[in-house]
Design a protein with these regions (language model features):
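Donor-nucleotide binding loops and adjacent catalytic segments primarily
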Residues: 1-70
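Acidic donor-binding loop of glycosyltransferase active sites
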Residues: 69-79
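Acidic, glycine-centered active-site loop in nucleotide-sugar glycosyltransferases
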Residues: 89-91, 105-115
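A short, well-ordered alpha-helix in the C-terminal region of glycosyltransferases
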Residues: 138-151
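C-terminal alpha-helical cap of glycosyltransferases
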Residues: 149-173
Length: 173
């Protein structure tokens, strides 16, 4: 399953990307598109899904952990929360269409350390997805790079995002 995430308010040509992915993926593959709060993208994708049985559009969900666990590959924006979740779950990723600033720095970091492939267009994204899905070695290297982040750091970042707090290290006696 290819999990496509458009960010909470959408990003770029998600419908075009999803439809082109469906045409290029093996017939036993399917695409789940998380539209977040973007009702326009959700409605448009739902219209297509009536005729395309391998397309599953989803609105806002608080169960991203389940989608990440089921995904063979994630395609999405390099937002801070998404990047953290991808690294925590160890899912191969293609990060695209970054917003200048924080997202572009996330993209640079994840691509520099081999934790994701970065793309700037639908065409590049389709090519990157094809390369990743056809190479188990490439996916494994990416997941290994994601796991190389110290887990204490990932846990602290996750706690900060979810709870607004960071656990303090235990005092040494």
């Amino acid at each position: 399953m290819v999990l496509v995430m458009s960010g909470s308010i959408g990003c770029g040509p998600m419908t075009t990307l999803a439809l082109k992915l469906l045409r290029r993926l093996p017939k036993d593959s399917f695409v789940v598109v998380i539209c977040g709060k973007n009702k326009g993208d959700l409605k448009e994708l739902q219209r297509y899904a009536k005729f395309l049985e391998r397309l599953y559009p989803v609105g806002f969900t608080d169960r991203m952990d389940l989608y990440y666990s089921a995904a063979d590959l994630v395609v999405g924006k390099p937002g801070g929360l998404s990047c953290t979740e991808i690294a925590q779950k160890g899912v191969p990723a293609v990060l695209m269409l970054s917003v200048p600033g924080c997202e572009s720095r996330n993209l640079e970091f994840f691509t520099r350390y081999g934790m994701a492939l970065g793309t700037e267009s639908v065409r590049d994204t389709l090519s990157a997805v094809r390369r990743l899905l056809s190479s188990a070695a490439m996916r494994n290297r990416m997941m290994l790079a994601q796991r190389s982040i110290p887990q204490g750091a990932v846990a602290a970042i996750t706690d900060l995002i979810e709870k607004g707090t960071v656990p303090l290290p235990a005092k040494e006696e």
